[in-house]
Every structure is written in C-alpha cells, then in structure tokens.
Amino acid sequence: MTKGILGRKVGMTQVFTESGELIAVTAVEATPNVVLQVKNIATDGYNAIQLGYQDKRTVLSNKPEQGHASKANTTPKRYVREVRDAEGEFNAGDEIKVDTFQAGDYVDVTGITKGHGFQGAIKKLGQSRGPMAHGSRYHRRPGSMGAIINRVFKGKLLPGRMGNNKRTMQNVAIVHVDVENNLLLLKGNVPGANKSLLTIKSTVKVNAKHPEVKMAGVSASATTEEA
C-alpha cells in the first residue's frame, strides 16, 4: 500500500543527526491535500485516490473543474495528482497532512528538473572537447555524424534543450516531520527549483536496506505528540 502527498519545494538547509553528523536537507511545504475523488476497480478499473493541492481562483477554473471540486466540498485546485493503491480508507473531502509520514520513512520524490535552455554537447552530455590550439577548427562541436550513411541515426547525442524533465529520486529519507508548520525535511537534494511542485510517495523498493537517520534533539515520538 502507498502513502502520498503533494508539496512545494522551499529550499535547502542543514541539520545535525544524533550521531553529530551534519547533513543537508530539503524543506518541503505540504499544506493539507484534499481528496477530490476515490477510484476503485468496480468503477475505474484500478484503486487510487485523487489529490488536490493549492487553491485556484474560481475565475481561472472552468465549470467541469468547479463541479468536480464541489463533490468534495472544496474549491478548485491548481494541482491534481493520483496516488494508486493508497493506504487507508478515504472519502471525497478528506484531508491528508504531513503526519501521514513519520521520521525514518523512505519515499520516492518526483519533480520537474531545472530548465537550462538550449545547450551544447559538452555541457548537456559531458562530451570531451577538441584541441583548443590555433588552427584546430574543432573545439566544442558535437563531432562527426557518421562517415557512411546520408542520415543521422536515431539516438545520436546532439545539442538541444537541457533540463525541464520529470525525474524521480528513490529512497529519500525523511529526517523530520513538522506538523505545526506543514513541513517535511528530506535528506539530500530533490529535483526541481524552489517553489516547484513535488509528489512524495512511499518508496517502491521496500526491501532495500535503509540506514536510520535521526535529527538531533527530536525523537520519533515527538512528532506524534505535536500532532
């Protein structure tokens, strides 16, 4: 079964673990998500819940969006995503908060990477440059397209748009859950720029060996007591 929530990347900071190690963490603000729809095998062919995140002004939403949100007694949402095989029983209109996770859980984080525009083969693909000596005529170009056939083979690594791709980082540790401020602290970096949307779900690699990470001065039970 899967747990999931939508959030917004705030930025990065540092915290100390109980062992005294200083680690980098990413702060994710995940205000309460609203369950817009509950899907099941009988009606939709699969089990899932549809989550809505961040209110959208009514003037910017169309009638179908307004009608869909009204069934859950809420306003239209800017972001709508699905979580398949969600853990627990849900009804339309329920809220999912950060306390669905706890410190020590491992999650998969999906986001849109930073866009870098049109870039050459060296920056985008890490290819080697040519000689920089005078008269070389070959410095930062992609190189030969092939000496025989009069076309470019599919899959040829060439300059082009860099970044702005959907990427998932697996097995990211949750270092701390701040229920009062709707924050999750995730170990390390995650895809995307600040303020970008992140989808956080339970990790799919449940059998992987995960080292335990605990934030100094905060016990696992402290988060539950705050809630």
UniProtKB/Swiss-Prot annotation:
Q: Which keywords describe this protein according to UniProt?
A: Ribonucleoprotein, Ribosomal protein, RNA-binding, rRNA-binding
Q: Report which superkingdom the organism of origin falls in.
A: Bacteria
Q: Is the keyword rRNA-binding in the record?
A: yes
* One Pfam family linked to the record: Ribosomal_L3
Recall the GO molecular function terms of this protein's record: rRNA binding; structural constituent of ribosome
Biological processes, Gene Ontology terms = translation
**One GO cellular component term:** cytosolic large ribosomal subunit
Q: Does the keyword rRNA-binding apply?
A: yes
Q: Quote the PANTHER family the UniProt record gives.
A: 50S RIBOSOMAL PROTEIN L3, LARGE RIBOSOMAL SUBUNIT PROTEIN UL3C
In the record, the note on similarity to other proteins reads: Belongs to the universal ribosomal protein uL3 family.
- Cite the record's note on assembly: Part of the 50S ribosomal subunit. Forms a cluster with proteins L14 and L19.
Summarizing the function annotation, the protein's role is: One of the primary rRNA binding proteins, it binds directly near the 3'-end of the 23S rRNA, where it nucleates assembly of the 50S subunit.
What name does UniProt use for this protein? Answer: Large ribosomal subunit protein uL3
Gene for this chain: rplC
